[in-house]
């Protein structure tokens, strides 16, 4: 499949900006969907490309939210939908997690059917490992997750829990389920590719002028391994989700999902493998000497994970999409250096 005109949602985000960069570098024409003109202006500053235009969609859950954005001459060949919340912060109601993910996904698929059914041949959706399996737990001893797995989290769990992790897992699971159900029921002319990454780390491609503007995963790295409040004696933080992927590899998977005909109607797990807090700390301390005095030391060289910690099978992504993964040392050393630069720029 060779696509030339692409609609990309969430283009101003951590993952979306890398996808946008790789699409433009591959000579795609892209319409970026963002929530406000100010966000469009920021993205334009980062990507002054004549192959980029914008659509403003303030509320991706509103009926017909994407209809105007999907009108294009030349028409769109493909759509990449990345817009969804990843905010582990207090919300007044768990619908704040669920609605943008589920309704945003169904709205864009329905919009394609209404407005661009004759031209769109492929839709790529960014889901999450959260829709597949455990989230920072080791209770699935020796489990090797595959794209056939689904998290057991129910909708009732999500609406009644006080655990934001459960609400987030549900938002990803039911948004993705809605997409597959739509394809099965409506039988559209387009096919569907879903990408399921775990924790996403790596250098930023979009403008971030303050530490407080970091996405959640990179903010975690800053707070636990880079922030000046830490010392070598600071206790090594819990591992959290121990599967990860470099943001650039995830973005490349989105690009390949457009380019490879055989990827259609497939779900791809994407992870470079396991990583522990100890391994991240070891890399930061070794590769960024100026941070040695403020990165927890722990037990250098230790794996920092149980031998039975779960893993995932990424062979389909490697075979079908041709994905190779960035070395762990490169991912975390480049990120740590960039975080120190942001910190210095804001005078912290």
Model-predicted regions and their roles:
Residues 247, 302-324:
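Conserved C-terminal active-site "lid" loop/helix of NAD(P)H-dependent oxidoreductases
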Residues 217-221, 234-256:
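Substrate-positioning beta->alpha
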Residues 37-38, 42, 46-103:
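NAD(P)H-binding glycine-rich loop region in Rossmannoid oxidoreductase-like domains
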Residues 3-33:
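N-terminal Rossmann NAD(P)H-binding glycine-rich loop of SDR-like oxidoreductase domains
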Residues 74-77, 92-124, 176, 254:
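NAD(P)-cofactor binding segment of oxidoreductase domains
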Residues 154-192:
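Active-site Tyr-X1-5-Lys
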